[in-house]
Amino acid sequence: MTVRDPGAWTVDELRPDDHDAWAVLHRGYLDFYESTRPDQVTAVVWQWLMDPTQELECLVARPAPGAPPVGLAHHRPFVRPLHGSVACFLDDLYVAPQARGTGAVDALLAALQTRCRDRGWEPVRWVTRESNARARAVYDRLAHRTDLVTYDLPVGPPAP
């Protein structure tokens, strides 16, 4: 796959008939992050994406209209009390290895940027591993790195 022009891609909403191709992409993403339960996670995320009451959405990149997706962007709104506004959190961004370097990521991010502009969500925010050099090179070209530090506070299992 040698497409390099982001405008040559079709980026649209994930559809129910995309399940199998999406699942391959999602498992690739989970493998990259060394998930220990990929099948269970993939099933839950698919249910969220197909449930209109959930906020999580997915844009996919296709090399041509109607073709199976080769990239995904899971995203959702989040409120910003400090600013009194709504922004977009990009939870997952993944492109199949054979489609990397072809403009698919640029196309996904451009489509997400347009969607967020249309909805009044500002900015689009995401995190990545410090060691993810290839992705960070793209992100550094398209976005601004913040000085925010991310923390996770474990909460443990639910009380009986």
What is each model feature region?
Residues 1-17, 159-160:
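Conserved N-terminal entry element of GNAT/NAT acetyltransferase domains
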Residues 19, 23-48:
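Conserved GNAT-fold acetyl-CoA-binding loop/helix
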Residues 48-60, 89:
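A short helix-loop-beta-strand connector motif used in the catalytic cores of GNAT acetyltransferases and
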Residues 60, 68-77:
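Conserved beta-strand in the GNAT
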Residues 68, 78-90, 100, 146-147:
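A conserved beta-turn-beta hairpin within the catalytic core of GNAT-like acetyltransferases
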Residues 99-111:
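Conserved acetyl-CoA pyrophosphate-binding loop and the N-cap/start of the following alpha-helix
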Residues 106, 130-149, 153:
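Conserved active-site alpha-helix within GNAT-family acetyltransferase domains
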Residues 117-127:
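Conserved GNAT acetyl-CoA-binding A-motif
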